[in-house]
């Protein structure tokens, strides 16, 4: 049995189904229960189901929009007290998964935008909104590993595009009170880029 889906398999599943959803649980036990419940609720495919810092659990799935929504709603209803974040995106931006899995090919780097959130769900939704707002490239979307449960996104593009994208991401992440911090660096030093890329 294959434990983890390869990046290629994840991208293929996304092309077939389009919608993605996530539930971020307070505990590992609840997370595993939610993953089982979500699979039994509707025809969805689990892309990620794993513990993250600090002892939380992420479930990321794909499928038809109605199936993903039904699965997320069922998990939220059954375990409302232990759900820290969730979302359903009907048409996620194509750059989301390469950014999550460190497979983004970044060509021309210009301005740098950073958004940091208190949970993973907010970071993904903010990244999706940013990428759809202006012509920017998502560089990385780091989810809750080694950062006490926080997450962040990095993106690049022209200063105006990065500024607009970061402002949109801030607005989206603030809706649930999950925005921690953000910045736009108009012209990052090349040595900084060397450490990021």
What are these regions (language model features)?
Residues 7, 17-55, 69-102, 106-150, ...:
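Long, contiguous binding/interaction regions
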Residues 1-12:
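N-terminal amphipathic/basic-hydrophobic helices that include classical n-h-c signal peptides
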């Amino acid at each position: 049995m294959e434990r983890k889906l390869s990046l290629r398999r994840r991208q293929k599943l996304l092309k077939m189904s389009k919608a993605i959803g996530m539930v971020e649980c307070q505990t590992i036990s609840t997370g595993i229960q939610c993953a089982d419940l979500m699979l039994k609720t509707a025809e969805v495919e689990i892309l990620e189901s794993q513990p993250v810092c600090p002892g939380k659990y992420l479930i990321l799935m794909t499928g038809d929009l109605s199936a993903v929504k039904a699965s997320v709603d069922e998990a939220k209803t059954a375990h409302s007290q232990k759900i820290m974040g969730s979302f359903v995106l009907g048409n996620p931006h194509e750059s989301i998964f390469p950014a999550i899995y460190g497979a983004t090919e970044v060509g021309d780097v210009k301005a740098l935008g950073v958004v940091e959130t208190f949970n993973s769900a907010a970071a993904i939704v903010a990244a999706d909104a940013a990428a759809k707002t202006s012509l920017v490239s998502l560089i990385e979307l780091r989810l809750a590993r080694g950062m006490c449960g926080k997450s962040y996104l990095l993106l690049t593009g022209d200063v105006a595009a990065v500024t607009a994208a970061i402002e949109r991401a801030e607005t989206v992440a603030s809706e649930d009170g999950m925005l921690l911090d953000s910045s736009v660096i108009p012209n990052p030093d090349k040595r900084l880029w060397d450490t990021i890329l």
